[in-house]
Amino acid sequence: MDCCASRSCSVPTGPATTICSSDKSCRCGVCLPSTCPHTVWLLEPICCDNCPPPCHIPQPCVPTCFLLNSCQPTPGLETLNLTTFTQPCCEPCLPRGC
């Protein structure tokens, strides 16, 4: 059960900004790309040992997609680069009920 001690979570490569946080059922990280073109099933954690299935991360939990789909006013949204959809996020959005 100590396989994660010397290994790291697989992180998607590319220009997309990732938000990594630990998952409750796995010791590896959950990597959440903050760009909308990524599909939901690519946002599930990758574990290096036998662990329970991770929670499903709903689409609104992607930070930039949540901002673009939110009906609440978002100050500074007009300054986003709509070509890259990259924007830092202070608090990672995690699904409830894990």
From Swiss-Prot:
<comment type="similarity">
    <text>Belongs to the KRTAP type 3 family.</text>
</comment>
<dbReference type="GO" id="GO:0005198">
    <property type="term" value="F:structural molecule activity"/>
</dbReference>
<feature type="repeat" description="3">
    <location>
        <begin position="89"/>
        <end position="93"/>
    </location>
</feature>
<dbReference type="GO" id="GO:0005829">
    <property type="term" value="C:cytosol"/>
</dbReference>
<comment type="function">
    <text>In the hair cortex, hair keratin intermediate filaments are embedded in an interfilamentous matrix, consisting of hair keratin-associated proteins (KRTAP), which are essential for the formation of a rigid and resistant hair shaft through their extensive disulfide bond cross-linking with abundant cysteine residues of hair keratins. The matrix proteins include the high-sulfur and high-glycine-tyrosine keratins.</text>
</comment>
<dbReference type="InterPro" id="IPR007659">
    <property type="entry name" value="Keratin_matx"/>
</dbReference>
<feature type="repeat" description="1">
    <location>
        <begin position="3"/>
        <end position="7"/>
    </location>
</feature>
<protein>
    <recommendedName>
        <fullName>Keratin-associated protein 3-2</fullName>
    </recommendedName>
</protein>
<keyword id="KW-0416">Keratin</keyword>
<feature type="repeat" description="2">
    <location>
        <begin position="47"/>
        <end position="51"/>
    </location>
</feature>
<dbReference type="GO" id="GO:0045095">
    <property type="term" value="C:keratin filament"/>
</dbReference>
<feature type="region of interest" description="3 X 5 AA repeats of C-C-X(3)">
    <location>
        <begin position="3"/>
        <end position="59"/>
    </location>
</feature>
<keyword id="KW-0677">Repeat</keyword>
<dbReference type="Pfam" id="PF04579">
    <property type="entry name" value="Keratin_matx"/>
</dbReference>
<comment type="subunit">
    <text>Interacts with hair keratins.</text>
</comment>
